[in-house]
Amino acid sequence: MLRKHVLLVEDDLNFGSLLCRVLQRAGYNVDVAASMAEAKEFLTLTQYAVVIADWRLSDGDGTVILGWASQLGAKTALMSAYLLQMPGGRSFDHETLTKPIPPQEVVSLVQRAIGTPTAFST
């Protein structure tokens, strides 16, 4: 079986790299997109179990990406330091993570959404 695939959309490259490493250590395949355009390209190429996107990206709104991902069957989560400032407060069709986010919280969210990754036997 293949490991479960996660797309992380984060324009802060350092934070995106940190979350990517933490999720990879937990056993997930992870792609990191730094923009909406890059995320859209990833979504056309790969089927993701979970997509986690930052709200404020350099080229748009992360909730748009989550809408695309949801239509493709992925579980979704929005992360931002500005969630309380969003129109409609915290009423979303997906999970929310408020920055700063402890990396283990992201792993826990993915585990709740899709379970633990498949273990490989050697």
Describe the function of each predicted region.
Residues 32-50:
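Acidic, metal-coordinating helix/loop segments flanking the phosphotransfer/catalytic sites
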Residues 54:
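Active-site residues of response regulator receiver
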Residues 13-31:
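Two-component/phosphorelay signaling modules centered on CheY-like receiver
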Residues 58:
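The feature encodes the CheY-like receiver
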Residues 63-74, 83:
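Short amphipathic alpha-helix used as the core "switch/output" element in two-component signaling
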Residues 79-81:
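Hydrophobic/aromatic residues positioned on beta-strands within the core alpha/beta folds
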Residues 101-122:
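C-terminal output helix
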Residues 10:
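Conserved acidic carboxylate
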